[in-house]
Amino acid sequence: MAEHLASIFGTEKDRVNCPFYFKIGACRHGDRCSRLHNRPTISPTLLLSNMYQRPDMITPGVDPQGQPLDPSKIQDHFEDFYEDIFEELNKFGEVESLNVCDNLADHMIGNVYVLFKEEDHAAAALQALQGRFYSGRPIIADFSPVTDFREATCRQYEENSCNRGGYCNFMHVKQISRELRRKLFGRYRRSYRRGSRSRSRSISPRRKREHSRERERGDVRDRDRHGNGKRSSDRSERHDRDGGGRRRHGSPKRSRSPRNVREGSEERRARIEQWNRERDEGV
């Protein structure tokens, strides 16, 4: 029974826990949902609810005055917001991903999901965001159960084939330019490469301990094989002193004799006849 409940946890078959809150961290029913919303007490992911206010909030592609908006200006507005939020959250620790929803439903519009590398960094950011405002609006932040965005995002939206539009219950992640992504997240790759080079130049204390243990194990194996507790370096010095030979107990080096040539049948018969004559003469 326990295995069955664990296998259906967070799925449509689970009649106790809300699958949408488990996968997306948001549910269109909110607190009125008939299923449980298990809010995590600690998580590497924070949800900043309805934080991004797009310039075409009322009608996509049109400003509040009813004038059409240039798509490039909408993208610039979004990337300015994205960079601003990233730089602020990056103060608390390494940010692995930052996703902003492009959905239009009330429970998902403008939602910002930030996944930190460490849970402690997320907790520090959550503490610092309490009571703060952005663009004149209070920041509503909380831990989110979402840690794998592959299960939360709409695959049809990524393929430009979602027929639910902005009211889809899965995340429509708004994309940033490649240049901005390289600028923001590339710093971690550069710092990692620098750290790798510095680590390659010097051996860490842990590696030193492992190296010394390996050398000790090698010495024990040498003593077991050769006795006298001699190390391989001592044997190599003796090997060089003796001229590289393999002499043992002072015995001279033997030279191999050439192989005996097998006798023919006529030679054997002649030798046997000679033995018989010598035997008869002796008698």
Swiss-Prot record:
Bias kind Basic residues: ranges: 191-210, 246-259
Protein location: Nucleus speckle
Residues covered by the RRM domain: 44-146
Zinc finger (C3H1-type): 12-40, 148-175
Pfam families in the cross-refs: RRM_1 (PF00076), zf-CCCH (PF00642)
PROSITE patterns: RRM, ZF_C3H1
Biased composition annotated in UniProt, kind: Basic and acidic residues: 211-245, 260-283
Signal peptide start and end residues: none
Keywords, ordered alphabetically: DNA-binding, Metal-binding, mRNA processing, mRNA splicing, Nucleus, Repeat, RNA-binding, Spliceosome, Zinc, Zinc-finger
Family annotation (InterPro entries): Nucleotide-bd_a/b_plait_sf, RBD_domain_sf, RRM_dom, RRM_dom_euk, U2AF_small, Znf_CCCH
One GO cellular component, as annotated: spliceosomal complex
Region named Disordered: 191-283
Listed GO MF terms: DNA binding; RNA binding; zinc ion binding
Presence of keyword DNA-binding: yes
SUPFAM superfamilies according to UniProt: RNA-binding domain, RBD
Superkingdom of the organism of origin: Eukaryota
GO process annotations (BP): mRNA splicing, via spliceosome; photoperiodism, flowering
Family annotation (CDD domains): RRM_U2AF35B
Residues forming coiled coils: none
Function: Necessary for the splicing of pre-mRNA. Probably active at the 3' splice sites.
Family, per entry: Belongs to the splicing factor SR family.
Quaternary structure annotation from Swiss-Prot or TrEMBL: Component of the spliceosome. Homo- and heterodimer. Interacts with RNU1, U2AF35A and SR45.
PANTHER family assigned to the protein according to its UniProt record, in alphabetical order: U2 SNRNP AUXILIARY FACTOR, SMALL SUBUNIT
Protein name per the record: Splicing factor U2af small subunit B
Species this chain originates from: Arabidopsis thaliana
